[in-house]
């Protein structure tokens, strides 16, 4: 078994953080005490002087697991020992919805992150999403169906709630590399018990589907990452062209009907979808078809 080169891992993380403009900045790390976020936190602490970054940590006690109390105590002690500003939110069980708990938990997390960013004048939220997350998310979207735009890769940087940026420097690493780094440096972390449950689609893919695909080709995850990035690049080019076209056929806040219907059916669809996206409107595929049919009737 090939041993992970710790120095190489840290140099790659350092270069990625520099590429993402995380130097001389005040940042907020989203930490769950899982292996991914603890490796990110530990790695950035080692690189903090070189990068000249001021690290802050946000942690949410979701009250979803037996060990959440122990995890909360651990992260408090970890940050206190290293003089790291820590912001904790406790999501009380009484506030948990009966259904769609994952979606609700995500909303709670990001509302809390925004609050901390705003109150502490921090622009960058750093998360520990990694390469395996990228592939799993792609497969989940593929199964769910919908607009091809939704199949784009998880972005290394994206705007968050208009005023902030989410930065994901760990996308260049796979899960095995992260585990290996934690093991070699003796980094303490907690395993989420729910990761073992097949009640969640991501876990079913991780436990049963992806291993079969990896058996067919060990480079499967790498190939998925390549395809999603190619798709993202191509869609971004189309979006840029669409924005130019939209400017030409827009009339104040609306589209110029006469100019719009002169476009090919393919471009009509692209322009309509882009127009609705810019306006912040989400509609179903059947509704897009109905609108296009009415416009061309």
State each model region's role.
Residues 51, 216-219, 277-284:
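Short helix-capping/linker segments at secondary-structure and domain boundaries
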Residues 9-36, 56, 91, 108, ...:
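AMP-forming adenylation/ATP pyrophosphatase catalytic core
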Residues 2-208:
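Core alpha/beta nucleotide-donor-binding catalytic domains of modification enzymes
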Residues 142-143, 214, 295:
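Hydrophobic residues in alpha-helical segments
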Residues 172-250:
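Contiguous mid-protein beta-loop-alpha structural module that forms a pocket-lining wall or clamp
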Residues 116, 213, 275-276:
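Broad structural signal for hydrophobic residues in well-ordered alpha-helices, predominantly aliphatic
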Residues 38, 136-137, 203-207, 221-225, ...:
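Non-catalytic, well-ordered alpha-helical scaffold segments
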């Amino acid at each position: 078994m090939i041993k992970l080169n710790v120095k190489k891992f840290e140099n790659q993380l350092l270069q990625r953080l520099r590429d993402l403009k995380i130097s001389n900045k005040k940042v907020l790390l989203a930490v769950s005490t899982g292996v991914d976020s603890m490796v990110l936190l530990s790695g950035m602490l080692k690189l903090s002087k070189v990068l000249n970054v001021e690290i802050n940590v946000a942690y949410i006690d979701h009250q979803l697991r037996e060990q959440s109390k122990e995890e909360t105590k651990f992260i408090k002690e970890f940050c206190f020992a290293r003089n790291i500003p820590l912001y904790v939110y406790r999501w009380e069980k009484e506030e948990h919805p009966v259904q769609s708990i994952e979606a609700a938990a995500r909303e709670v997390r990001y509302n809390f992150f925004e609050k901390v960013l705003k109150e502490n004048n921090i622009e960058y939220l750093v998360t520990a999403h990694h390469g395996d997350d990228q592939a799993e998310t792609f497969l989940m979207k593929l199964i769910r169906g919908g607009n091809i735009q939704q199949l784009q890769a998880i972005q290394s940087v994206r705007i968050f709630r208009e005023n902030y940026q989410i930065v994901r420097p760990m996308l260049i690493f796979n899960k095995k590399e992260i585990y290996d780094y934690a093991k070699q440096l003796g980094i303490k972390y907690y395993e989420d018990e729910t990761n073992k449950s097949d009640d969640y689609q991501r876990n079913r893919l991780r436990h049963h589907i992806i291993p079969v695909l990896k058996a067919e080709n060990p480079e499967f995850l790498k190939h998925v990452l390549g395809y999603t990035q190619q798709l993202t690049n191509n869609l971004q080019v189309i979006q840029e062209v669409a924005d130019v076209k939209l400017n030409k056929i827009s009339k104040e806040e609306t589209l110029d009907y006469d100019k719009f219907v002169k476009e090919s059916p393919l471009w009509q669809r692209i322009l309509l979808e882009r127009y609705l996206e810019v306006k912040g409107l989400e509609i179903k595929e059947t509704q897009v078809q109905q609108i296009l049919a009415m416009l061309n009737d």
